Amino acid sequence: MTQSGRWKVVNFWAIWCKPCREEIPELRRLDEREDVSVLGVNFDGKQGNDLATDVASLGITFQNIEDPSQALGVPRPTVLPTTLIITPSGELVATLIGPQTIESLEAVIRQSGPPR
């Protein structure tokens, strides 16, 4: 999860989760920043065509990855949406529960200080 000196915002989502669907436009806007990569994780573990169908129907434009919980040494979320904020050096600095806005996500990044 340490790529290109960018902050990583890892968002766990599911198509049946209304707050997840509502925050996707905010995540798309955040992903446009030069210093941030938004990475989606489908909570239901969908792959292939099933995942592509959900991604297209929700208008997700950011990359989707496999669940990184084990690699990060954190438990898999039990509540959706859950968003992890990771510094460019790979340090997990925040686990956010519930829907986020671009402002709330940018505030966490700002408060976490300059990249380590």
Report residues per predicted region.
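Conserved segment of the thioredoxin-like fold in thiol-based oxidoreductases
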Residues: 22, 30-67, 80
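Thiol/disulfide oxidoreductase modules built on the thioredoxin-like
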Residues: 53-60, 66-116
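Proteins that catalyze or organize thiol-disulfide redox chemistry
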Residues: 1-2, 28, 111-116
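A short beta-strand-turn-helix
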Residues: 1-9
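Catalytic metal- and UDP-sugar-binding loop of GT-A-like glycosyltransferases, i.e.
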Residues: 12, 41, 86
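Hydrophobic beta-strand anchors of alpha/beta hydrolase catalytic cores
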Residues: 9-10, 38, 83
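Conserved redox-active cysteine motifs that mediate thiol-disulfide chemistry
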Residues: 12-29
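Solvent-exposed loop/turn segments at secondary-structure junctions
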Residues: 14-18, 44-48, 70-71, 99-102
